[in-house]
C-alpha cells in the first residue's frame, strides 16, 4: 500500500472509527459497512448534478446543496427504515458514515487528479474531510431529534438546512478567501463536537 493511498483513505476511516467507538450502543457492522458504501455511491449522481448545475468554480457553493441533499435522502429513505436505527446517536453514526463514504470516494477524485497528490491528500484531511464529517454529525443530530424526540418538522428542516449552509459557505470562501474558509470550518467543528457531546452525555445517563 503506497503513501498516497494511505493519505487518501486513512483520515476518513479514522473519523469513522472514532464515531463508531464513541457510540455506547454499537451498530451492526454489516449496516455500518453498507451505509459507508452507500455514501461512496452517492458520489456518482452528485458528480453528474454538479457538472450540470455548476459551470465553474465560482459556483462551487452550489455543491453544498446537491451533495447534502443526496446524503439527507439516503438517511431519510434508507437508514430511517432500519430496525437497528433506534436511538438519537444512531442518526449521528449513520449520518457520519454516509458523509465520510462520500468524502472518501471524492478524495480519490481530487487526490489522484492532482499534480501533487500527497499534498492534496494531506490538505483535504484537515479541510474537506472534517467538513463532510461535521455536516454528517449535524444532519444526524437534528434528524435524530425529529425521529426520536418530538416529530417537530423544524428539526427535520434544520437537519438539511445547517448541513447545506455550512457546506455551501465553506465552498464559497474556499474559492474567495481561505482565511474565512478556515473560520467557517472551525465554527463547524465546534458546533458538531458540541452536538455529539450532548448525545454522548445522554447515552451515559441511560447506562447509569
Locate predicted features.
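Hydrophobic alpha-helical segments at protein termini of multi-pass membrane proteins
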Residues: 1-208
Amino acid at each position: 500500500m503506497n503513501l498516497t493511498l494511505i493519505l487518501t483513505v486513512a483520515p476518513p476511516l479514522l473519523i469513522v472509527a472514532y464515531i463508531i467507538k464513541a457510540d455506547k450502543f454499537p451498530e451492526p457492522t454489516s449496516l455500518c459497512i453498507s451505509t459507508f458504501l452507500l455514501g461512496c455511491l452517492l458520489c456518482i449522481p452528485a458528480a453528474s448534478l454538479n457538472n450540470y448545475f455548476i459551470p465553474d468554480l465560482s459556483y462551487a457553493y452550489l455543491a453544498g446543496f446537491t451533495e447534502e441533499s443526496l446524503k439527507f435522502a439516503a438517511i431519510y429513505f434508507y437508514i430511517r427504515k432500519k430496525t437497528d436505527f433506534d436511538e438519537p446517536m444512531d442518526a449521528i453514526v449513520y449520518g457520519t458514515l454516509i458523509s465520510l463514504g462520500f468524502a472518501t470516494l471524492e478524495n480519490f477524485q481530487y487526490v489522484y487528479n492532482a499534480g501533487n497528490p500527497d499534498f492534496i491528500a494531506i490538505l483535504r484531511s484537515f479541510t474537506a474531510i472534517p467538513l463532510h464529517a461535521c455536516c454528517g454529525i449535524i444532519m444526524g443530530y437534528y434528524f435524530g431529534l425529529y425521529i426520536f424526540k418530538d416529530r417537530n418538522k423544524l428539526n427535520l428542516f434544520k437537519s438539511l438546512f445547517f448541513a447545506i449552509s455550512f457546506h455551501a459557505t465553506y465552498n464559497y470562501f474556499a474559492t474567495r478567501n481561505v482565511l474565512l474558509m478556515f473560520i467557517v470550518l472551525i465554527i463547524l467543528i465546534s458546533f458538531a463536537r458540541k452536538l455529539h457531546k450532548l448525545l454522548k452525555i445522554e447515552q451515559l445517563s441511560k447506562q447509569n
